[in-house]
């Protein structure tokens, strides 16, 4: 049989149990303290170990720093992009508002009669509005941020009125009211005629009616008073530029042409112009080393290439195309000039050589002839009367790889003396027409010497020779088809002696006129004055009568 018993714990306190609990608590506390110390030591050991690892891994540290810097740069670029996007949005809103203002201004014209004047006024107001758009936009943004705006939304007309009012207020055209909002909540109406600082026309100095002004160059004008200083015609706003002053843009361009040399606008209004070719150029190009053609006297434009001859003379491309380069090439021209003198009944009987030479050879021959050139005239030809040795150009140069003339052939040639005329020397490399004029001039010197006209006054002798050169140039203007009729009507410039080289180019025709102009406008006391005096005598009489008069007045070898 089972027995069930009940057990009840004793509630009596045992002192030995208290001591055991205290010891247990002490042991537990010591254990916890040791755990804390152990964890601290482990944490310090871990930190030291991490520091040691970092010190042995500088590349990892550098990469971390580089990533941080890249993150900063990326954030900066993102900020700049957001700022530019906001600015583009503001610019687009400004353009839309400007279009609204312009359309609104065009619809508010007073009448069709003053439509043109109103359009000009609207353009001025639109410009004024555009100048103040940014300020108005910024002011509106500040007001919105401060949450102090109590003005209800405005319709399109009210917005336009506000913009114009703000702009006029900023320019001092209306008074600054303490409260820009009237009782009805709208902005006060703008009267642009109130306290207007520019109500007087700068042209006629009289008052300007509302809507009839043009604002330019910082002042106001009547439309009819704002005229071009070149053509005196009114200037429309689309024909005007502040940088060019009170003139049409087209008139300014015509009055301020580009330099023929550097193709730039002239500084100010100072420039030089060739008296014949009418080519305008900057004054400093005369001294800055710009090449000048020794034949036509034109300066070399940038982008072109002049040719330098062996004696350092420059020749332009057009003159080079028709230049006579050696003695052999000049012989047909020599025969042509002799025929020209024969047609004037002034045949040159004596045969003597014609030689093309370089500049130095010509100077040397001039010195041996004891010719005293005191008049600053460039010598391009000479009639010799003494025997000497001359370096003649017998082989024309060829064009080198860099555009220079090379392989010029010269040879010494003995000129035999004992005669009134021993030879004629002319610079090589000049155009055929200029060479022909010089040859005609020197041939007249030869004719005078061979016919006993010696010891003439220099002004008279050079004047006669210039007249013959001028006459030959005039003969070159005749066409071969008109030769017969011209020869019968004029004894001075027979067309039968027109150029035998064939049809002249347009440039050669112009070069003939240039050479004639050089003779006619020469201001030297010997060549220029002498030509004009003799030419006047020949015009009043004839060349033969003048020569006979000189022969009658004086005996050969006398001083006239």
Swiss-Prot record:
<comment type="function">
    <text>Ubiquitin receptor that probably regulates developmental process.</text>
</comment>
<feature type="domain" description="UIM 3">
    <location>
        <begin position="155"/>
        <end position="174"/>
    </location>
</feature>
<keyword id="KW-0677">Repeat</keyword>
<feature type="domain" description="UIM 2">
    <location>
        <begin position="92"/>
        <end position="111"/>
    </location>
</feature>
<dbReference type="Pfam" id="PF12315">
    <property type="entry name" value="DA1-like"/>
</dbReference>
<feature type="domain" description="UIM 1">
    <location>
        <begin position="43"/>
        <end position="62"/>
    </location>
</feature>
<comment type="subunit">
    <text>Interacts with ubiquitin.</text>
</comment>
<dbReference type="Pfam" id="PF23625">
    <property type="entry name" value="UIM_2"/>
</dbReference>
<keyword id="KW-0440">LIM domain</keyword>
<dbReference type="InterPro" id="IPR001781">
    <property type="entry name" value="Znf_LIM"/>
</dbReference>
<dbReference type="Pfam" id="PF00412">
    <property type="entry name" value="LIM"/>
</dbReference>
<dbReference type="InterPro" id="IPR045218">
    <property type="entry name" value="DA1-like"/>
</dbReference>
<dbReference type="GO" id="GO:0046872">
    <property type="term" value="F:metal ion binding"/>
</dbReference>
<dbReference type="GO" id="GO:0043130">
    <property type="term" value="F:ubiquitin binding"/>
</dbReference>
<protein>
    <recommendedName>
        <fullName>Protein DA1-related 7</fullName>
    </recommendedName>
</protein>
<keyword id="KW-0479">Metal-binding</keyword>
<feature type="domain" description="LIM zinc-binding">
    <location>
        <begin position="199"/>
        <end position="269"/>
    </location>
</feature>
<dbReference type="InterPro" id="IPR022087">
    <property type="entry name" value="DA1-like_dom"/>
</dbReference>
<keyword id="KW-0862">Zinc</keyword>
